[in-house]
């Protein structure tokens, strides 16, 4: 039986304190046919550095600052993540939250 591919989309903005636990909760899922996509919304803390540490296990993208207006809205960030996702099923996760290992 083929398992559907699941894409977990995470938007991040200045959640340095939580992003490790968030990503690890996705990597530790019992379900293994998944991809994890983290889009950083131009964070000003060390979030992106932490995200990059997982670059061999996740897909990440950093949104460029638009003019001097600061970060873009969360919908735009999730749209970017959705565009590069390849899963048949999409799960959304905020970067200050986590999944239990049997979520997927």
Model-flagged regions — what are they?
Residues 1-104:
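Nucleotide-sugar donor-binding/catalytic module of glycosyltransferases
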């Amino acid at each position: 039986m083929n398992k559907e591919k699941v894409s977990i989309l995470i938007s991040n903005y200045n959640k340095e304190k939580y992003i490790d636990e968030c990503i690890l909760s996705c990597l530790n899922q019992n379900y293994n046919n998944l991809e994890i996509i983290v889009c950083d919304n131009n964070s000003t803390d060390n979030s992106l550095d932490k995200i990059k540490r997982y670059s061999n296990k996740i897909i990440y993208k950093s949104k460029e600052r638009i003019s001097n207006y600061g970060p873009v809205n969360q919908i735009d960030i999730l749209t970017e993540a959705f565009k590069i996702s390849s899963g048949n099923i999409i799960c959304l996760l905020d970067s200050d939250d986590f999944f239990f290992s049997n979520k997927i």
